[in-house]
Amino acid sequence: MLAPGQLERINFLANKAKTEGLSQDEMNEQQNLRQEYLKAFRQSFKSQMMGMKVVDPDGNDVTPEKLKEDQKRYRGE
């Protein structure tokens, strides 16, 4: 999870880069913030996928076997 204000800082640096450019320190900060954001996004996405179940219109579980296996590993079963 990103700390409060990090997303705003990412957006601020992106806008500044477009309008006036960034110093080397700001470019490094932007890169680090983007990496943290991607890590948090991927972790959140994986958590959502590991809780997902696919059901057809008849109510049958049609979750792909690969996903079921990954879910079992994720839960430690």
Curated annotation (Swiss-Prot):
SUPFAM superfamilies referenced in this protein's UniProt entry, alphabetically: YnzC-like
Highest taxon listed in the record's lineage: Bacteria
Subcellular location: Cytoplasm
Region spans: Disordered: 53-77
Compositionally biased intervals (Basic and acidic residues): 63-77
Gene3D superfamilies: Helix hairpin bin
Keywords of this entry: Cytoplasm
GO cellular component: cytoplasm
PANTHER family per UniProt: UPF0291 PROTEIN CBO2609/CLC_2481, UPF0291 PROTEIN YNZC
Family: Belongs to the UPF0291 family.
HAMAP family the UniProt entry points to: UPF0291
Name of the protein in its database record: UPF0291 protein EAT1b_0405
Source organism: Exiguobacterium sp. (strain ATCC BAA-1283 / AT1b)
